[in-house]
C-alpha cells in the first residue's frame, strides 16, 4: 500500500513539473508566436485569393522532408501535403497538395481554396468515410532563418470526393505541437506525444488524445500502467487485435545552461482498451524477439502486408566533445504484432540478374559518386561505406547499397500497366531520414527526406517503390542527382530577413523562382 502511494505521489510530481515547464515555454514563446502569426496571416491572405479548385498536371514536387504521404482509400493515388526545404540560408514551408497517380505514373497539383496554413512535421490520417477524408492535425511553421517556430493545434479535413478543405473547431484539443503521431482507430483518431519548442525552451509530450469522427469531439485519455516517457518522432501503428503500438522516438533534456542531451528511444509499448472498454485504456511494455533496428531517430513507418508495420531509414547521431558524427540508414525492418517479433527486410534481387552480380561488384569497387543517391538501370548491388569529413570536424558515415555503373535503363514497353513494373531498376533509396512512406496494393513507396554531408543538408525529391510481395528489387520512379542541388553558405547579412514571402513559399510561381535562384531541384 505504501509503495503504491509513493508511486502515485511521484507521478503527480512529474505531472506538476511538466505543467510548470509547459507554462514556462508558453510564456517565453508567446512573443515569437505573435510575430509568426502575422506572417502566417499574410500567407493566408495570399491563399484566400483562390476562388476555385484548379487541378493541373505538373512535374514531380520539389525536394522536401517532414511532409505527409497518404494513400487514397478508393483510388490508386498517393496524396502529398506540406513539408519543408532548407537551402542553407532560408527555410521554405509548403501547404501544396499533390496527387500521384500510380497507374499512370503522373503528378497533379491541386489548388483548393482556403487550405491549411503552410506547415511541416504534422500528421495526416486517411479514413474511408464520405468517399475518403484526409485528417490533418498540428505541425509547425518556421521563420525564414529557421530559429523561431510556431506550433499549430488546428484540425483540418480534406474531403477527397469534393476536393474541399474544412477546418474543424472543437474544444479540448491537444496543445500546439509537432513531431506527434496519429492513427485511425475504429471511428476515432488517436494522437500521442510530440513536442513544442521556443527559442530558449522546449517540452516533450507523452499524452494521449482521441477525436471522435462521429461527434467531432476531443477527449484526453488517462491510461493505467506505465507508458512511454515524453518524446516526439516515434512511430505508431494499429495491431490486428485492436491495440496501438508506440515504438522509438527522440527527446532531449537540459543538463546545464545551453547544454542539452538527446536520447534516442528504442523501447516499445502497447496501448489497448482495458476489458474491451473504449473509455478505459492501459499501457503495457513490449519486449519483441527477433532482429530489431539499431537505435535511431528520423525513421519512417507504414502499414505493410499482413498487418505488419514497416520501418525505413533514419539517422544515428553520436555527439562528441568537438564533433558530431551522423550515420544515415536505408534499411528495412518489419514488426509482426501477432508474433511480437522483429524481422529484417532482405531483398532477393531480380532472378534475371543473379549471374551478373559478381561482375557488378568488381566494377563497383573501382569507384563511386561522393553524394550518390540511387541510379537508373544499374545492376549488381553492393554495400559501400563512405565518410565525409567537413572543415568543422563533422563526420558523416553513409552506408549505401550501390550497383555497378554503365548499364542503361530499359525503355518502358507499351503493355506495362504500372510504374512499379515500368520504373528503372535501381539500387534503391539512398540512406536518409525523415522520408515519407506509403503502401498501396502491397507496394511500398518512399519519397524525399534528407541526409547530411558535413554542414550541408541534402533534401531529396526522388520516389522509389518496392513490391513487398516479391521483395526482389527497388524501382526508381523519380530520380534526382544530389550533386546538382546548390547549397548556399550561411551569411551574417540581414538580407535573409527580407523577402519573407520568397523564404516561406509565397504562391507557386514565387516558389519556383526562389528555388531556381537557390539551385534547388524541381
UniProtKB/Swiss-Prot annotation:
The modification Phosphoserine is found at residues 413, 418. It comes from the Eukaryota. This is Kelch domain-containing protein 4. Residues 11-24 have a biased composition (Basic and acidic residues). Kelch repeats lie at residues 77-129, 133-187, 188-241, 243-289, 308-361, 443-494. Residues 1-10 have a biased composition (Basic residues). InterPro entries: Kelch-typ_b-propeller, Kelch_domain_protein. Keywords: Kelch repeat, Phosphoprotein, Repeat. PANTHER family: KELCH DOMAIN-CONTAINING PROTEIN, KELCH DOMAIN-CONTAINING PROTEIN 4. SUPFAM superfamilies: Kelch motif. Pfam families: Kelch_KLHDC2_KLHL20_DRC7. The lineage of its organism: Eukaryota, Metazoa, Chordata, Craniata, Vertebrata. Residues 1-33, 346-378, 402-432, 481-522 are annotated as: Disordered.
Amino acid at each position: 500500500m505504501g509503495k503504491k502511494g509513493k508511486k502515485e505521489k511521484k507521478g503527480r510530481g512529474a505531472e506538476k513539473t511538466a505543467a510548470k515547464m509547459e507554462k514556462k515555454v508558453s510564456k517565453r514563446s508567446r512573443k515569437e508566436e505573435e510575430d509568426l502569426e502575422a506572417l502566417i496571416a499574410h500567407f493566408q491572405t495570399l491563399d484566400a485569393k483562390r476562388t476555385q479548385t484548379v487541378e493541373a498536371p505538373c512535374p514531380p514536387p520539389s525536394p522536401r522532408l517532414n511532409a505527409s504521404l497518404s494513400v487514397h482509400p478508393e483510388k490508386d493515388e498517393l496524396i502529398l501535403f506540406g513539408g519543408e526545404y532548407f537551402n542553407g540560408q532560408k527555410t521554405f514551408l509548403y501547404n501544396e497538395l499533390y496527387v500521384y497517380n500510380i497507374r499512370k505514373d503522373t503528378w497533379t497539383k491541386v489548388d483548393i481554396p482556403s487550405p491549411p496554413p503552410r506547415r511541416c512535421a504534422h500528421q495526416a490520417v486517411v479514413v474511408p468515410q464520405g468517399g475518403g477524408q484526409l485528417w490533418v492535425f498540428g505541425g509547425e511553421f518556421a521563420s525564414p532563418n529557421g530559429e523561431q517556430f510556431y506550433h499549430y493545434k488546428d484540425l483540418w479535413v480534406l474531403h477527397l470526393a469534393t476536393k474541399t478543405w474544412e477546418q474543424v473547431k472543437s474544444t479540448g484539443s491537444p496543445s500546439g505541437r509537432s513531431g506527434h503521431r496519429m492513427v485511425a482507430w475504429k471511428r476515432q483518431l488517436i494522437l500521442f506525444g510530440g513536442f513544442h519548442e521556443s527559442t530558449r525552451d522546449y517540452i516533450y509530450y507523452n499524452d494521449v488524445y482521441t477525436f471522435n469522427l462521429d461527434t467531432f469531439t476531443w477527449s484526453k485519455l488517462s491510461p493505467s500502467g506505465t507508458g512511454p516517457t515524453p518524446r516526439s518522432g516515434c512511430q505508431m501503428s494499429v495491431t490486428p487485435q485492436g491495440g496501438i503500438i508506440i515504438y522509438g522516438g527522440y527527446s532531449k533534456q537540459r543538463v546545464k545552461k545551453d547544454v542539452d542531451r538527446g536520447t534516442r528511444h528504442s523501447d516499445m509499448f502497447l496501448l489497448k482498451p482495458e476489458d474491451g472498454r473504449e473509455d478505459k485504456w492501459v499501457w503495457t511494455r513490449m519486449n519483441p524477439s527477433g532482429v530489431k533496428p539499431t537505435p535511431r531517430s528520423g525513421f519512417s513507418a507504414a502499414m505493410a502486408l499482413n498487418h505488419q508495420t514497416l520501418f525505413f531509414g533514419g539517422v544515428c547521431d553520436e555527439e562528441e566533445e568537438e564533433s558530431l558524427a551522423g550515420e544515415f540508414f536505408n534499411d528495412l525492418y518489419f514488426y509482426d504484432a501477432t508474433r511480437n517479433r522483429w524481422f529484417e527486410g532482405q531483398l532477393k534481387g531480380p532472378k534475371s540478374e543473379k549471374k551478373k552480380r559478381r561482375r557488378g561488384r568488381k566494377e563497383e569497387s573501382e569507384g563511386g559518386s561522393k553524394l550518390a543517391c540511387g541510379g537508373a538501370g544499374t545492376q549488381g548491388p553492393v554495400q559501400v561505406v563512405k565518410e565525409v569529413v567537413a572543415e568543422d570536424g563533422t563526420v558523416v558515415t553513409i552506408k549505401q547499397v550501390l550497383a555497378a555503373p554503365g548499364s542503361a535503363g530499359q525503355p518502358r514497353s507499351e503493355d506495362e500497366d504500372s510504374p512499379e513494373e515500368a520504373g528503372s531498376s535501381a539500387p534503391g533509396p539512398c540512406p536518409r531520414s525523415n522520408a515519407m512512406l506509403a503502401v498501396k496494393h502491397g507496394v511500398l513507396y518512399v519519397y524525399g527526406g534528407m541526409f547530411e554531408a558535413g554542414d550541408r543538408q541534402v533534401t531529396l525529391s526522388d520516389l522509389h517503390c518496392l513490391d513487398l510481395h516479391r521483395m526482389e528489387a527497388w524501382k526508381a520512379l523519380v530520380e534526382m542527382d544530389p550533386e546538382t542541388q546548390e547549397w548556399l553558405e550561411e551569411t551574417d547579412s540581414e538580407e535573409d530577413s527580407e523577402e519573407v514571402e520568397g523564404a516561406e513559399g509565397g504562391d507557386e510561381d514565387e516558389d519556383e523562382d526562389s528555388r531556381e535562384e537557390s539551385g534547388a531541384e524541381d
